[in-house]
């Protein structure tokens, strides 16, 4: 999963789009003077799994050297994901950039025989100068986060009540609306590693005895046709989204993290919405798709003034690409929602994927522009 880092004074730039992992976020777009570090994904995990670097901007260049067991590299500070590249199947490569302070970090390549390594960063780094435009972007996006977590709680309350009451049809009707606000802010929500698996894990993401949240209820509603045994799950889900609402109010943000989140929301579309994996029982994937795109656009809008100062033509292209994606989605609307994902043809999904790829290619340039001195 993709996550916006939450560590103070950290700058992060990353791309993890499955559909275009080898093409976006190249190291040529990295901040000037960045240290470039190359890693391979193998059956063993990250190679090398012990590395050193000076404090400051670092570009992580990651390539899958032929393994199906390991498809991502994460840099962790404790249990917090600072940056990652994911969905790298055999032959694909990707990059992400971080500005790291002195300290010891974990290199995590899940699935390898030796999953964890160490990155030691030495020396000092200068604190970022105050930037009124960046501060305005942070304030704007924080308001968006708080608005959507409020909507998430408000939509989850009646959904959970319907599940607890055993009203299958009402719960089915309310399910898509409860998903929307979470999907809009997914990278920030995922940064809270304890909460996200409880709220949004899919059946194959966690051990069977840890499977909770939206998708466990989704399976019960659409596969089993009952809410039997789901009351504790619904109560737990409601408690977790309320905890997320509280945590979002104090999350630390940087402007570049917001820009990175815009990219990572498109990565969510490529990795799980275009494939139909996310809502595999209800098939309301296009609801999630639109919410991810809306969240990406909101994050971009927050940092747009910063980007416009340096590349106004890029801003115009990104705005046009967002409109193209919405236009492609519009052709699949039905009533107040969308057709089931299973009704899409191969040509339909190809058109949607191409729109996301075109948008992501342009949007991936934004974080590097923001961190330029």
Give residue ranges: language-model regions.
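Bacterial N-terminal signal peptides that target proteins for export
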Residues: 1-13
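C-terminal motif of bacterial Sec signal peptides marking the signal peptidase cleavage site
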Residues: 20-23
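Bacterial signal peptide processing site
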Residues: 25-27
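N-terminal edge beta-strand
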Residues: 33-54, 154
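Extracellular/periplasmic metallocenter environments
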Residues: 38-41, 88-130
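Beta-strand cores of secreted/periplasmic/IMS beta-sandwich domains, seen most often
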Residues: 49-68, 94-110
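Beta-strand signatures of extracellular beta-sandwich domains
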Residues: 72-74
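Mature extracytoplasmic or organellar-lumen-exposed domains after removal of signal/transit peptides
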Residues: 125-373
């Amino acid at each position: 999963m993709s996550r916006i880092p939450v560590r103070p004074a950290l700058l992060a730039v990353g791309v993890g789009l499955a559909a275009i992992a080898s093409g976006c976020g190249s190291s040529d777009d990295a901040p000037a003077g960045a240290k470039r570090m190359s890693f391979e994904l193998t059956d063993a995990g990250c190679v090398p799994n012990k590395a050193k670097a000076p404090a400051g901007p670092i570009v992580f260049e990651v390539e899958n050297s032929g393994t199906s067991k390991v498809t991502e590299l994460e840099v962790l500070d404790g249990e917090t994901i600072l940056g990652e590249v994911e969905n790298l199947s055999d032959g694909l490569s990707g990059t992400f950039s971080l500005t790291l302070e002195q300290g010891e970090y974990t290199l995590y390549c899940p699935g390898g025989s030796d999953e964890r390594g160490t990155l030691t960063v030495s020396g000092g780094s200068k604190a970022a100068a105050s930037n009124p435009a960046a501060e305005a972007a942070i304030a704007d996006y924080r308001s968006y986060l708080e608005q959507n977590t409020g909507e998430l709680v408000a939509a989850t309350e009646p959904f959970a009540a319907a599940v607890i009451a055993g009203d299958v049809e009402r719960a089915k009707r309310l399910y898509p609306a409860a998903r929307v606000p979470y999907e809009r802010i997914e990278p920030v929500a995922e940064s809270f590693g304890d909460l996200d698996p409880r709220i949004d894990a899919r059946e194959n993401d966690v051990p069977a005895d840890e499977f909770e949240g939206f998708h466990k209820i989704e399976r019960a509603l659409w596969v089993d046709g009952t809410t039997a045994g789901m009351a504790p799950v619904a109560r737990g889900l409601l408690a977790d989204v309320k905890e997320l609402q509280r945590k979002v109010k104090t999350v630390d943000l940087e402007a570049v993290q917001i820009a990175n989140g815009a990219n990572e929301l498109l990565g969510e579309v490529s990795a799980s919405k275009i494939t139909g994996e996310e809502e595999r029982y209800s098939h309301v994937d296009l609801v999630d798709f639109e919410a991810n795109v809306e969240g990406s656009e909101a994050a971009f809008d927050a940092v747009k003034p910063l980007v416009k100062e340096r590349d106004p033509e890029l801003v115009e292209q990104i705005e046009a690409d967002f409109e193209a994606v919405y236009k492609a989605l519009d052709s699949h609307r039905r009533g107040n929602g969308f057709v089931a994902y299973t009704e899409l043809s191969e040509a339909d999904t190809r058109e949607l994927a191409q729109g996301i790829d075109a948008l992501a290619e342009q949007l991936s340039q934004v974080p590097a522009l923001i961190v330029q001195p």
